[in-house]
Amino acid sequence: MKVCQKSIVRFLVSLIIGTFVISVPFMANAQSDRELRAVWIASVLNIDWPSKKGLSVKEQKQEYIKLLDDVQKMGMNAVIVQIKPTADAFYPSAYGPWSEYLTGVQGKDPGYDPLAFMIEETHKRNLEFHAWFNPYRITMNHTDLNKLSEDHPARKHPDWVAAYGNQLYYHPGIPEARDFIVKGIEEVVKHYDIDAVHMDDYFYPYKIAGQEFPDQAQYEQYGKDAFSNIDDWRRDNVNQLVKQINQTIKAAKPYVKFGISPFGVWRNAADDPTGSNTKAGVRNYDDLYADTRHWIQEGDIDYIAPQIYWSIGFNAAAYDVLADWWSNEVKNRPVHLYIGQAAYKINNNFDPPWSDPEEYVRQITLNRQLELVKGSMHFSLKDLNKNPLGIKDSLSTDLYSKPALVPQMPWLDNTAPKKPKLTKVTEDKNGNLLQIKDHPSNQKTKETAYYAIYRAEGKKQRTLLATQRKTHEQQTFLDNTADPNKKYTYYVTSADRLHNESKASKRTTK
C-alpha cells in the first residue's frame, strides 16, 4: 500500500471535503454506498462480551461468533471491541495482566488469545476491527493496589497511580506513565491485524463534587514552569498522549486509523462563544480536560465520534444542535465525523422522545442529511440485541437494509488496487456463481483486502450487493438472491483495507 506525503494530502483533502453542510430533506433516509455502521462491544463489567466471567474457551468463542452474526444481520460494517478496559488485556501483554473479565481472576491465562481469535472471525465477515483502549483507568470499584494481580504494572509503579473516587488511574501528568500507555498500544498495533485504535470519553475522570483529582504534586514537578494553571497543564497532558499515540501508530502501520469517541459537548456557548448552543453540565474541555478541537485542528486523529446521547430538541443539549456543531468542527479538516448513538436509552430514559420508536430513526436520518457526518457508532450491541421499540428490526429491514462500504480516508492512502477479473458467471439452482480472480499486481503487493460485488438488473443503476473478504487469488461468490428469470450485469471491484476501490470488472448473465 502506498502512503501519501501527509502534508500534501491533508491539503488536497481539505479542498475536497471542505464543503458546506447542507440538508437534503427529500433524501432523508437514502442509504449511501459509503457509511460507517459500527457498534461497541464492551468487555468492562462483562457488558457485552464475554457475558460473564469464567466461561470456557468454547463458550467465549461461541458467544463472540453469535454476536458477529447479529452484527451482520443488522447491516453493520465495523465493531469496536474493548480489549484493555482496566489496564489489563484480552491478549498476552507485557504491559498489563490478563483481564479478570475473561476468567474471573486477573492475570489468569484464558487458554487462548482472544484478540487474535476475534480479529480473525471479524475479518472473515469483512467487518472492520477497532481495538478499544481505556488509557488511564486501572480499577472500577476499589483503590487497593494489593487486590491487583502480583505482576500488575501499577503495583510495580505505585508512584504512577492516583486514587479518585473509588477507582485507581494512571497519572496523566507523569511522562513515564504516558510512555508506558503508548507502548502498550504500540504492542497491539505491531502484533495484531487491527484496522483502528479507538478510545472513548474517559480521559481525566468525570468530576466528583467536593473532590479534586490528586495531581497537585505532579503539576508542581512537571507542569508549573510551563503552565500558569493546572487546567491548561492537564489538557496538555491529554493532548500529548493523543499526539504520541497517533505518531506511534503511523510509524508502525500508517494504514491503521486512530479515532476517539468523546463526550458530546466540547464547551457551551456560555463558556466560549464558539462553543455549542447547549447547557451541558459536563464539558470535554473544562471537566475532562479533553480538548477535542485541538486534536482535530492538529490532525492528531483520523475520526471523531462524539457521544451525542440526547434526543432531538432536548433542552440542555439537543442532538440536532450538536450534530450540526460537530459538523462545523470537522469542516475543511481531514477527519471523519461519526456520531455516537445512545441505543441504551431507547425506551429506557426519563426524556419522553426515547419512548418514541421513531426517535432513533430520526437521529440516523438527520445524520444522513449532514454531508460531513460519515456514519454512526451504536452503544452498545447488548442494547441493540434487546430490540427495544423494534430498533434492531428497523436497522436490518430499513435503515441498514442495503450494505455499505466504510468511507475512505484519502489522507492516509488514496491509491486504489488494480481491478480484478470477473472470469465467469454461472447460473445454477442455488443462484448465480461468480468466479473472481485478483489482478497479478495486487497479488504481489497484497493490496486487495476484499471485493465489492455490485449488481444491475437490465438497464437499472447498479447497487452494492455484498462484500467478500479476499481469501485466495481466485475465489467464488454466490448470489443466492438472483431471480433465475432475470438478466443481471455484475460488477466486481477490488478494495484495499482503507476502502479505496479499483475500477470494476463486469459480466452479464445470459
From Swiss-Prot:
Keyword tags: Glycosidase, Hydrolase, Signal
Q: Disruption effect? A: Cells lacking this gene show up-regulated sigma X activity.
Assigned EC number: 3.2.1.-
* A Pfam family of this chain: GHL10
Q: Which GO terms describe its molecular function?
A: hydrolase activity, acting on glycosyl bonds
* Signal peptide start and end residues: 1-30
What PANTHER family does the database record attribute to this sequence?
GLYCOSYL HYDROLASE DIGH
| Family recorded in the similarity comment | Belongs to the glycosyl hydrolase-like 10 (GHL10) family.
Name-wise, this protein is Glycosyl hydrolase YngK
User: Which species does this protein come from?
Assistant: Bacillus subtilis (strain 168)
Q: Provide the organism lineage as a comma list.
A: Bacteria, Bacillati, Bacillota, Bacilli, Bacillales
